[in-house]
Each structure stands twice: as C-alpha cells, then as structure tokens.
Amino acid sequence: MTNLRKTHPLMKIINHSFIDLPAPSNISAWWNFGSLLGVCLIIQILTGLFLAMHYTSDTLTAFSSVAHICRDVNYGWLIRNLHANGASMFFMCLFLHVGRGIYYGSYLYKETWNIGVILLLTVMATAFVGYVLPWGQMSFWGATVITNLLSAIPYIGTSLVEWIWGGFSVDKATLTRFFALHFILPFIITALVIVHLLFLHETGSNNPSGINPNSDKIPFHPYYTIKDALGLILLLLPLLTLALFSPDLLGDPDNFSPANPLNTPPHIKPEWYFLFAYAILRSIPNKLGGVLALLASILVLLIIPLLHTANQRSMMFRPVSQTLFWILAANLITLTWIGGQPVEQPFIIIGQLALYLYFLLILVLMPLAGLFENYMLEPKW
C-alpha cells in the first residue's frame, strides 16, 4: 500500500512542502528565519485571538480592558506580554530574513522577493494599527502623528486623513476601525505567506554559495526539521525571557498613561522596530518630502533585483560588496538610534547623513561594487 502522505490530496501538499522537499545541502542558520517567522505569525494570531476575546474597542474602556486582561484574566498578563514582545521577535526575524536575502542574492527570485516586500509592508501596517489599541498616550499620539502624514498628499490629503479617522480627530471611530483592521490583517498576511512559499517552491531555495544547488539536494525532513526545531528553541528562549522577566523593557512608559488629547507627550516615538523609518521621516524638513523618503526607504527593496550588477549571485566571495553590506547594516542601526533621540543637534545632522548614506549605498555604491568586482575577476593576461 502506498504511503497515505504521498497519495492523500492534502497530505501530498504538506509532504511536498515540508517533508520530501528537496533542499540544498549547505543552507546555513540564516535560512532558519523563514520558519521562525511562520512560528511568530502563529504565536501572534493565537495570543491576539485570546486578547480579542477580552478587549473592548471603545475609547472609554479600551485602556481599562487591557488592564483587566493583565489583572483579572487567567494568564492574561502572559498572553499580553507574549503578544507585545512577540511583535519585537517578529520584526527581529523579519529584518534578519531581509538582510539574508540581500547578502546572498535571494532577491533574484523576483516573484518571491516582491511578495516578501509586500509582506513586510503589511506586517508594518498591522503592527502600527495594533499599537494604537491599548489607547495609551503613545498609542493616541502615534496614531495622530502618523495618520496626519497622509495630509501631505496634494489635493486629497486632508479629506483622506478625515476619512481614515472617521471624524475630525483620532477618536472612537478610529479605534474601532483599527481594531477591525488589526484583526483581519494577520489572516491576509497568512494568505500572502502561502503565495510567498508557492513562488519559492517553484524555484527551490537559494544557498550561501549562490551556485545552482540542483546537483546536491537532501530531503527537508529530518535534516531541516530538526534544524528548524533548534532555531525555534533559540527564538522562544529570548521571547519567554522578555515576556516573563522584563515585559515592558521595549515599551514606552508614556503608554501606561491613558490617552489624553489635551496633553502631548514630550517625545513622540514609535516602537523600536519603526525607529529607522521614523528617523528617515524626520530627517527631511519638508512634510511631503519626509513621507516620500519614508515610503522610498522600504519600496527601494523592490528595485534591488534590477540593481544587481555582479556576475556572482551571493556576496560570499565578494569582499567589497560585503563591506558595503555591513556598512548598510551599521547605518540602519544608527538610524534606529537616531529615531529614539530628540530633534536637536547633533542628532539631526547624524540622521540626515545616515539617510543619504542609506540611499547612496543601495542605489549607487553596491551596484558599482558589483561592476568593480566583475572587473577584478576578469583575467588580465
């Protein structure tokens, strides 16, 4: 009798995706983040579902309902802490996953890469609307400041902002619709993830060398299932440590005060994973310019495949490109730091320099490095 896993219509899909999938024999730990992101998504959906059972999306009771979850619901504090810190882990894995894609040339699988960029934008949108829900000071003012950016759009800007708000300011209508969006978006993300995997399995995984791995493949199970299990343990360790020992470490103290439209916090800033984008937004003195730079900082990922000039796919054997890649990584860390600082010198000029360097590296220096490396590898005799 043929194995059910190879004949049953549903089991066959699972089998071809996670069990008998031919995988390159040399993929490193950098390839673990895809499965870790899947686990993060599952954790966020499950914890979010249980939080939604006790949360109320009304301006009068939202803040109290979160306090109620933490105080009165069985293990509510744990569910909330896992959800809040799970978002940080999600973004940590996302940034490393994107970085891996840039370093090893995975962006040359254009469909997979483009769906991935759309996923990144969708996850960022989900995190933003989710941050508004506890209805603390930073939730309220963060929502006000970021939605207000749309008013920079010529002609329709103001009407668009009021349409999103559902009134003339961030209020009950805004909170209710943000809750609805925060509930539905993870399921849209799940659908996009399936499409992402569908495109990936059309081509098979890339590998650190960037060379076609078809001559040397191994089955996904047991080799990479056990490797992913180790990655999962190493992900859960910091997540549980954060959630159980210092759950508020990455949060903002201002969010422990209920939202007050009459009192603006001294420094409005988002969660750490948005600080790089916030720094880019603030680095341009013009409102519309800042919004365009903010959009460009993420959408620039879409044109990275078009800027690939090197004859080799991966940066593994390209030292000049490697150096520029790590400068880019340091630059993003600098932007993250600047995003959390007040708008004063020397932070303003550092932020502006980091912004220019960010686009210079991606759009000019890295493509030039690829051409230079091609030239250096050509035989000169």
Curated annotation (Swiss-Prot):
The lineage of its organism: Eukaryota, Metazoa, Chordata, Craniata, Vertebrata. Component of the ubiquinol-cytochrome c reductase complex (complex III or cytochrome b-c1 complex) that is part of the mitochondrial respiratory chain. The b-c1 complex mediates electron transfer from ubiquinol to cytochrome c. Contributes to the generation of a proton gradient across the mitochondrial membrane that is then used for ATP synthesis. Disulfide bonds: none annotated. Belongs to the cytochrome b family. One of its GO terms (molecular function) is metal ion binding. Coiled coil: none annotated. Binds 2 heme b groups non-covalently. This is Cytochrome b. The cytochrome bc1 complex contains 11 subunits: 3 respiratory subunits (MT-CYB, CYC1 and UQCRFS1), 2 core proteins (UQCRC1 and UQCRC2) and 6 low-molecular weight proteins (UQCRH/QCR6, UQCRB/QCR7, UQCRQ/QCR8, UQCR10/QCR9, UQCR11/QCR10 and a cleavage product of UQCRFS1). This cytochrome bc1 complex then forms a dimer. CDD domains: cytochrome_b_C, Cytochrome_b_N. It comes from Myrmecobius fasciatus. It is found in: Mitochondrion inner membrane. It is a multi-pass membrane protein. The chain crosses the membrane at residues 33-53, 77-98, 113-133, 178-198, 226-246, 288-308, 320-340, 347-367. Heme b b566 binds at H97, H196. Keywords: Electron transport, Heme, Iron, Membrane, Metal-binding, Mitochondrion, Mitochondrion inner membrane, Respiratory chain, Transmembrane, Transmembrane helix, Transport, Ubiquinone. Its cofactor is heme b. Heme b b562 binds at H83, H182. Pfam families: Cytochrom_B_C (PF00032), Cytochrome_B (PF00033). It comes from the Eukaryota. A ubiquinone binds at H201. One of its GO terms (biological process) is mitochondrial electron transport, ubiquinol to cytochrome c. The keyword Membrane applies. One of its GO terms (cellular component) is mitochondrial inner membrane.
